[in-house]
């Protein structure tokens, strides 16, 4: 038995490459990556897109232009998004059409997100906003068809136009006391939305903000 253990140890020491079990490492390999503005991004073989660095993400454009996010050609590979502490803003169109994403991690350093940021992330069932977030853009979660519940953080004063439109399975929205305005189409075609309480501080509810409200 001792001789067997001795030769096994020697084998691990002599041939470490490819034997991740010897050092306990099982991290997935990076298959794509680069920079975007002042930030760095990587996509690993197991589908995790990670954004790291300090400062805001750039604003991007939709899929018909040359200014799409650098990971856009690989959206069908992405199943999870992790934004690192230090990133302060999610750019316009940042994660559009990431249809297979089921998990999103947003750090406390993020205070805002742009328009169409999570457009058509149709596999995402829930998302947790950081407490410091005070603004998200128009159409930010448009067509997130699997999204079931949303808790909007204290500090947000406006739910923008069509922010959650066509989230067909959204049933519950928790709104903060800081909320003042719900813009037109904010929850348009969210026909399963049955659990929502409008805070006393809301003074403006625009036409079409909720299904059946005209």
What kind of feature is each model-predicted range?
Residues 4, 16-17, 158:
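Compositionally biased, low-complexity segments
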